[in-house]
Amino acid sequence: LLTGTSAPGAVITIAIEKSGNGQTTADAAGNWTLIWTPPVKTGTWTITATSGGVTATQLLRVQLPGNVQRQPIIEPVLRYGTPEISHPEAYQEMTDRWRIAPPPYELTEKVQGRAIGKQGGTLDPYNQNLFKGDLPIFGKDWFFNFTGISDTLAESRTLPTPSGVSAVKPTSITVFGKDNQNLFNENLIASFDLFQGLTAFKPITQRFKATLIANLNYVHLRENGLVKPDVRRGTSRTDAQVSLNEFFYERKLKDLSPNYDFISIRVGSQPFNSDFRGFLFNDTNLGVRVFGNFASNRYQYNLAVFDRLEKDTNSGLNTFELRDQQVAIANFYWQDFLVHGYTQQFSVHYVRDEATFHYDRNGILVRPAPVGIFTPHEIRATYLGESGLGHIGRFNVDHAVYYVFGHDDLNPIAGPDPKLKDGDGVRIGAGSAALEVSYDRDWLRPRLAFFYASGDSTPRDRKASGFDAIFDSPNFAGGGFSFFNRLGIRLAGTGVALVERGSLLTSLRSSKDEGQPQYVNPGVQIVSAGLDVDVTPRLKAIFTGNYIRFDKVQSVEAILFQGNIHKQLGTDLSLGLRYRPLLNQNIVIVGGGAVFLPGRGFKDIYEKDRPLVHVFTNVILTF
């Protein structure tokens, strides 16, 4: 039934596309109706009404009862993922969800951009692709996703570099030599992900995943005895490594509600970040993890146990050798905690690091740490943590608080008990806190942050009160753009580092990858201010300034046999740029520069008062 209005007594001619014509006459009030009898097929058709030389058009959508016919735009039927039918003649073909072409639209703002929604090829990640999880690879719900990544890093920096009698140049026979260093690192990553389930909303039923990484790294320094203990090996090193870094099987154990609440298990080498910012444990390693949610996803939880694999020294990738360190983690997430938009987390971490003796690939002793009394010792520590992430009104708030307690059989800096009362062990008791507050205003995000890790003021009092993490990788206070966070700074002549690469903690560890946690350390205080700027949709700039100081200095003085070291480490100024030329993650170019202005404490330790600089470029190509 078609209706409309026109001039009283006017004759109206109606035409429906591909269905013929009809006529009717308007009544005295100007209203007209027409019962359309010619057949109209399912589809969208144009209706044309003509009266007295005036023409009006309108679209008509027709949906007839019965099966939906296959759309001509997506013929022919793809041979992948077609359901097996025992009697095809008893069925009428219907369009499935993977072959319904979405409306065409452009990925970029350019008019000549390629439209989305077309059948793609094997090497086309933007349109439907069998190898990107867009179509079932077999059956009705088995999908395969291949990801290939090239991660290329070039870096140049100046760092305090120890020298000695075997120096490259006669002018370098002092405590510190030439400080220029260069690094090149290339990772080729191939990830294979086969999973059963749906591509959205519903949790995956089961999954097999493996990730291969081929690494090539080159480092060049200006002094001998650093890339290898043997000074005859020169000042540069080239190394390569291939690692099966990630391999696991995941299985959904049970659906808990109609709202996709579930419980699943994952077994194998798998990535896991135990909190929002990676303050305590952020690693890909061998373990078993049970995880899930309930109450319509308002609550999530993880129960995980890791028996960690040894890391390769120069690439940081996993090997197949167990390192005799076990980690157990339980955490609980509560969304909309007290206020909407804020997620609270509670966690318990336990680490047992066994007494072992281990040299890294470069021939350097890393367990136990070659400082003080370097005797193999066992560490057992428990971390209690509370953290949160979200927004309160217009303010973005991120915080974390941790307390660690436990026992270290023989801390190398504390040494044996001089009173011979309770053995040579030390009691661990230390804390850490972090807070960041930011405010989004249009394309600007100013932020303020504070980070604190307690230090040990009395290294030999049988209580270790310096905070250290299990395996941290924090994205905080400038993250990887910060000089202090990004670059490891060694303590000359001690075999330990003031701070490890990719860490904020002045933990005095021999190595973050291969060494043991070290709870007799100076701790650190960091006050940070920054500004994130979305310059364009393609370009983001990150400005950060950090003021850094020791919490306590006594443990550093004990190692260096040097008194009156000041607490001020220095000021870290950094700029980071992230550029996405295609407005997606397929090509990402990251660059940055940082300047470290030494404070009085840094000058006391390294005899350096001129600024240290760091620049890098990182190109990430993803398929």
Language-model region placement:
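Solvent-exposed loop segments that connect transmembrane elements
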Residues: 164-174, 224-229, 314-320, 355-375, ...
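Outer membrane beta-barrel
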Residues: 187, 191-312, 433-486, 570, ...
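Short loop/turn motifs that connect adjacent beta-strands in outer-membrane beta-barrel proteins
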Residues: 115-146, 157-161, 195-208, 253-263, ...
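Signature for the C-terminal beta-barrel architecture of outer-membrane proteins
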Residues: 259-262, 270-463, 527, 534-539, ...
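N-terminal periplasmic/intermembrane-space "pro-region" immediately following the signal or transit peptide
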Residues: 64-205, 442, 446, 458
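Ser/Thr-rich low-complexity repeats and stalk/linker segments
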Residues: 1-66
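C-terminal beta-signal and adjacent terminal beta-strands/loops
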Residues: 552, 582-610, 622-623
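Outer-membrane beta-barrel "beta-signal"
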Residues: 575, 610-623
